[in-house]
Amino acid sequence: MSTNGDATKVVVIGGGVSGLATAYRVMKADPSIDVVVLEANDRPGGKVRSVQVGDLVLPSGADSFLARKPWAVQLCKELGIGDELVAPGATGAHLWTARGLVAMPKQAPFGIPGDIGQVFSWPGLSGAGRRRAALDLLKRKRKDDSDETLGSLLRRRLGDEATDRAVAPLLAGLYAGDIDRLSVRATFPDLQRWESWQGSLIRGAQAANRQSRKSDPGPMFVRPRGGVDRLTDALTAELGSSVRTHTVVYAIDATDGRQRVTLGDGTTIDADAVIVSVSAHEASLLMEDLAPAAAADLAGITYASTGVVLMVYAEGSQAGLPDGTGFVVPRGAAPMTAATWLSSKWPSDAFGTRAVARCYVGAVGEEDILDAADADLIAACAKHLAALVRLPDLPQHAAVVRWPKAMPQYELGHLDLVARIRRSLPEGIFVVGQAYDGVGIPDCVRAAGEAADAVVAYLQRDPAGISNDEETVR
């Protein structure tokens, strides 16, 4: 707590989902704390935002979030927008192959079939690839329980063909990453548990399906009606004047047992705690002088640059789309890494009979495409879609949104790296965000709650070792 009689102040640097949710949780835990959120851009929300494409407003960031991780859904309910949550109007996805799109197996968690019959009819694989994948049921499990790459686990269990053609396009796409560098423990720990407990990924998928049928989990993905922006807008409304936009932070220093945040205009804010919720490379620059060891480790978290190409087609074009919500692409096989049919996924939006597509471009090892001009990116994606499905050669309206250094890479050793960063931070400094504990919105919300709890506990400590409650009693 502040020792000079002023209100206890907490500064949150960064107004994305993580920063807003952490500030909200701190404010709710102790309304007496003066919380201020500093956001460099003209609006909070981070990568959760929409853009105008013709007469439509379309998501350039997340268009939904995982409902089976409950934290974002719970936050929506807490904010009074829980009754606005809607599920997609279509389900299922396709896999790109050289011969066209093929439907991905149903009831295949993480893209892995839970039935041997599905394995031997696995779309997109050769007979040899299917037979190799089926050996997962016979191969001995790994005895060493240390971390390994996602690619190492998948290739050992299912073989290269099933890994590269069928599973990696889905899993690696979520991180825009390289499966042979991503940590399985930091990205998809369930896969490691499946091998350990079931001795097989196929049996693990089968067990997951049985559990899912027992628990009736409901829709896998949801969003507030009107878009995910509703969540960040609701958080911003709750925080009110605590959120300051157009505010660049230059540095963080420690002085007299408190933290001092220096802004880009040279003014300073003294705080009892600072929560850093910007990218790891930005956090590294802020802490170069204050915590050089932490800064060096933060700089070691690499990022992939990505982008989206949003395309609105003419009236009547929706009929040319296949069933499902879109497709994923094996590494390097097409200009895009995946595509979503927004008009199929969210039919309640005002699309009419127009097909609306969102193509994802850029990933680790595939970032050069982002150097292309907007018109060339649009033309490349549109040409590829027209060859795959019954769409016109070009959309009526289109937009390109680039996200430079946007997706943190949870490479082998990521969990140890994050633990080391947090151990080396000075007292009163906390980090939270996509770079540390999960890239999806539910994981960011969960981590925000944990960070807020840690901040409040830190502020309520007594330097003499006596809790505030004990001091009050005395």
Predicted regions and their residues:
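Conserved Rossmann-like nucleotide-cofactor binding loop
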Residues: 18, 43, 281
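Mid-domain catalytic core of redox enzymes
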Residues: 247-357, 363-372, 387-388, 467-474
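N-terminal Rossmann-like FAD-binding beta1-loop-alpha1 element of flavoenzymes
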Residues: 8-37, 456
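Conserved flavin/dinucleotide-binding core of flavoenzymes
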Residues: 3-4, 8, 50, 105-107, ...
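Short loop/edge segments at beta-strand edges and connector loops
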Residues: 87-89, 245-247, 253, 433
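Dinucleotide-binding Rossmann-like beta1-alpha1 core, especially the glycine-rich loop
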Residues: 54-141
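Glycine-rich FAD pyrophosphate-binding loop
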Residues: 27-54
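Active-site/ligand-binding neighborhood in enzyme catalytic cores
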Residues: 131-251, 259
